[in-house]
């Protein structure tokens, strides 16, 4: 659900505070201390990051300031994150309807448990380890840019449109992962889109299908998946392939107008979006019954109907895996 937040906190005067909403005032209280006052519009969470040595830079996108916050020594990565955040916001504003807030902050944060990014309203945590061009990011081209696009897309799918992330995780994570590749398509062209889709969706799904734990249903509660690996592959990769298949069937105008209508219907709403809501929005936009296609990708484990082991072999060859 959405809420309005009115938050006051007292911190050392030289600390930087990055928070959901907008800062209304900052006033001195005790020696060396400041009271900071933040208020938000309708958002689903309130989060803040406090640091004593953040640096920042920003770019305007329409009526929004996109600001990157980074640690000393990470200026290169921080500037790239700012640029990619602005580019992603521009693309998604056009495709899904305008981002409604005046600020979007991308913050370098040390994350654990394998996370590269975490979404919050108006604030995106970006894994600090990936700001440097280390061996991992060199091995996976465009990795950090993909993470940024994914997290920016969450401002629509989780931020504006709320869903039950436990029961139907694919509604935000799968859709967000798919439209992150659409960002590459819009910004760089069809070849980069295909590469990102093959690397991030098709390869992990086919590897699980033919060299891992097999297929599974996408739309099930998070703790019903047999392992974290199966959860990640189904919710982030197979679900994204499902949205790509739907787009292929209904065509771009219907697909993107359906997503925009879905976002508009649930923006700031106390209603929680369900899989049926998204399917109906795409059906209304396209004039097609998508029940069979939807069930095939999200409610069944029928991947062997679509792919063979030879597809995995060829894909690995193509990607140089």
Segment roles from a protein language model:
Residues 1-149, 190:
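Hydrophobic helix-coil surface modules that form long, contiguous segments used
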Residues 3, 77, 81-88, 140, ...:
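Stable alpha-helical elements in mature extracytoplasmic
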Residues 81-82, 165-173, 228-235, 268-273:
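Active-site metal-coordination segments of metallo-dependent hydrolases
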Residues 63, 124, 150-155, 209-223:
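Active-site-adjacent bridging/hinge elements
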Residues 1, 72-74, 161-162, 221-229, ...:
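Flexible glycine/proline-enriched surface loops and loop-helix/loop-strand junctions
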């Amino acid at each position: 659900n959405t809420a309005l937040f009115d938050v006051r906190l007292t911190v050392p005067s030289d600390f930087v505070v990055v928070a959901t909403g907008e800062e209304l005032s900052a006033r001195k209280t005790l020696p060396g201390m400041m009271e900071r006052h933040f208020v938000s519009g309708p958002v689903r969470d309130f989060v803040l990051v406090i640091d004593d040595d953040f640096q920042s830079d920003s770019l305007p996108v329409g009526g929004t300031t996109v600001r990157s916050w980074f640690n000393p020594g990470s200026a290169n990565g921080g500037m790239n994150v700012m640029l990619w955040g602005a580019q992603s916001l521009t693309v998604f504003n056009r495709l899904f309807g305008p981002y409604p807030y005046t600020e979007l902050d991308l913050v370098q944060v040390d994350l654990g448990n394998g996370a590269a990014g975490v979404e919050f309203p108006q604030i995106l945590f970006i894994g600090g380890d990936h700001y440097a061009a280390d061996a991992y990011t060199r091995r996976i081209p465009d990795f950090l840019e993909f993470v940024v696009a994914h997290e920016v897309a969450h401002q629509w799918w989780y931020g504006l449109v709320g869903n039950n992330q436990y029961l139907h995780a694919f509604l935000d994570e799968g859709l967000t992962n798919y439209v992150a590749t659409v960002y590459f398509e819009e910004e760089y062209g069809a070849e980069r889109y295909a590469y990102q889709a093959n690397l991030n969706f098709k390869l992990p799904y086919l590897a699980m299908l033919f060299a891992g734990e097999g297929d599974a249903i996408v739309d099930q509660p998070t703790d019903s998946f047999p392992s974290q690996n199966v959860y990640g592959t189904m919710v982030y990769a197979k679900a994204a392939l499902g949205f790509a298949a739907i787009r292929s069937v209904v065509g771009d105008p219907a697909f993107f107008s359906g997503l925009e209508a879905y976002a508009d219907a649930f923006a700031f709403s106390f209603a929680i979006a369900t899989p049926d809501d998204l399917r109906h929005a795409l059906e209304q936009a396209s004039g097609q019954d998508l029940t069979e296609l939807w069930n095939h990708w999200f409610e069944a484990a029928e991947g062997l109907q679509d792919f063979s082991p030879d597809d995995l072999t060829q894909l690995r060859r193509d990607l140089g895996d």
